[in-house]
């Protein structure tokens, strides 16, 4: 019996060594020895959740800039702490007024969603409306974000009470005039915004492409007509806390929401409040992960902060989660935002594996597959594979950075957790993606 035990143990050990050798050879072939990654910093971790053992590791305990792979951690926090339906606001009715406590909900009046229960509630209110902002303790722009990207829609400012995704959506429509009176004036051009604004707007030179530029420190916009028949561009506005949002909401709502003073806040202390919910949490997380929506990610983390700490405090909630939920990570990460926009973020592939494993073991597998994009969807739309199921994962990319972490189905029909992080490369993201894709398809 003892001989049989040692024989089986030896076979299992040799089989494990053989598998690791095979994966090492494939990692060398497709990633580590490839000329496109010769100067890059690369980390690889492949983990079998069925026995909680690593199948392969290469520099997986090193720290990397994860870019949007941070959204995996934000997803974990949101699933753990946010209710099934997002908290839009807390509603407190006083004798002569209504006090609104914002919860950081990014879906309010966002064009992604058609129904907005909070807006309906505000519209039907018969008492004067007031809002508090003493639960906000976070900068509008994250630490380590690029200030040069202030005009880009992927870097909208964060706020306690977002409206319209904290973006102004601009539209250009060109059409041929039916009965032009001037042969040199045959085109009608209509440019408008959603929401409508009362901020300064000017016009720049006409160009081939419709373009809108906001002043860096002012909500003033310069529009350049394009030659497209129809075009659109979304531009972040300066939130000024919640002031800009309230200004935009005034026209949409037809009512003024005033900032609550200390006297009103004092009156509300002993009053019973109720929560107004908005969209389904998992719907927002799916959109966030499929298109890598930075605004949804950062606001989701702030909503988690409101649930845990009763205030929107990004540094504090990150420390709380690291201390109480992610204290078993093998290497302490540096985590600074919910989206991964910051280059200050640093995570190891081993840390990603740990979080992926927690997600898989805690939540329904079908839910995970709904939230994460698969090959051919969202940010994985360029990955092609004949199998109906091959990969569910999150990309992360910025200049010199490409990461991919998630779940991969091997040719033996086994789901594995994986994390591949590439930093300091000088190739294109598409080149790095194809190398990683080839490696994963070879497993």
Name these PLM-found stretches.
Residues 26-29, 193-198, 385-392:
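Short Pro/Gly-enriched beta-strand edge/turn motifs at strand-loop
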Residues 68-78, 219-226, 242-252, 284, ...:
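Active-site-proximal alpha-helical segments within enzyme catalytic domains
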Residues 80-331:
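Conserved serine DD-peptidase/penicillin-binding transpeptidase domain
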Residues 18-63, 82-85, 120-127:
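Beta-lactamase-like hydrolase cores
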Residues 1-29:
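Bacterial Sec-dependent N-terminal signal peptides
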């Amino acid at each position: 019996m003892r001989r049989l035990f040692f024989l089986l143990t030896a076979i299992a050990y040799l089989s494990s060594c053989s598998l690791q050798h095979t994966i090492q050879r494939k990692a060398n072939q497709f990633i580590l020895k490839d000329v496109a990654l010769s100067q890059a910093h690369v980390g690889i971790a492949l983990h079998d959740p069925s026995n909680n053992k690593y199948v392969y590791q290469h520099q997986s305990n090193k720290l990397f800039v994860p870019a949007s792979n941070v959204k995996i951690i934000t997803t974990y926090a949101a699933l753990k702490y946010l209710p099934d339906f997002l908290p839009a606001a807390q509603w407190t009715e006083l004798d002569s007024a209504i006090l609104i406590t914002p919860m950081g909900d990014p879906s309010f009046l966002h064009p992604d969603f058609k129904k907005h229960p909070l807006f309906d509630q505000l519209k039907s209110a018969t008492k004067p409306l007031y809002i508090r902002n003493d639960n906000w303790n976070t900068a509008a722009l994250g630490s380590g974000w690029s200030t040069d990207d202030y005009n880009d829609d992927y870097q909208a400012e964060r706020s306690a009470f977002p409206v319209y995704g904290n973006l102004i959506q601009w539209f250009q429509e060109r059409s041929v005039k039916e009965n032009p009176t001037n042969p040199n004036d045959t085109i009608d051009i209509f440019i408008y915004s959603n929401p409508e604004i009362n901020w300064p707007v000017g016009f720049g030179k006409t160009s081939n492409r419709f373009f809108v530029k906001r002043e860096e420190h002012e909500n003033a916009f310069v529009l350049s007509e394009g030659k497209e028949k129809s075009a659109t561009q979304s531009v972040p506005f300066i939130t000024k806390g919640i002031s800009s949002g309230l200004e935009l909401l005034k026209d949409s709502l037809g009512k003024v929401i005033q900032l609550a003073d200390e006297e009103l806040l004092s009156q509300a202390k002993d009053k019973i409040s109720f929560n107004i919910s908005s969209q389904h949490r998992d719907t927002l997380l799916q959109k966030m992960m499929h298109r890598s929506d930075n605004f949804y990610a950062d606001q989701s983390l702030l909503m988690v902060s409101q649930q845990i700490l009763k205030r929107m405090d990004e540094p504090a909630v990150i420390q709380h989660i690291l201390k109480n939920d992610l204290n078993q990570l093998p290497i302490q990460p540096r985590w600074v935002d919910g989206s991964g926009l910051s280059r200050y973020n640093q995570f190891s592939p081993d840390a990603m594996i740990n979080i992926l494993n927690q997600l898989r073991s805690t939540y329904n597998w079908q839910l995970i597959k709904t939230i994460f994009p698969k090959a051919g969807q969202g940010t994985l739309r360029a990955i092609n594979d004949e199998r109906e199921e091959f990969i569910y994962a999150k990309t992360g990319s910025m200049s010199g950075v490409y990461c991919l972490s998630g779940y991969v189905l091997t040719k033996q029909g086994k789901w594995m957790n994986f994390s591949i992080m590439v930093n300091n490369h000088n190739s294109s993201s598409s080149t790095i993606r194809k190398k990683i894709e080839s490696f994963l398809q070879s497993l």
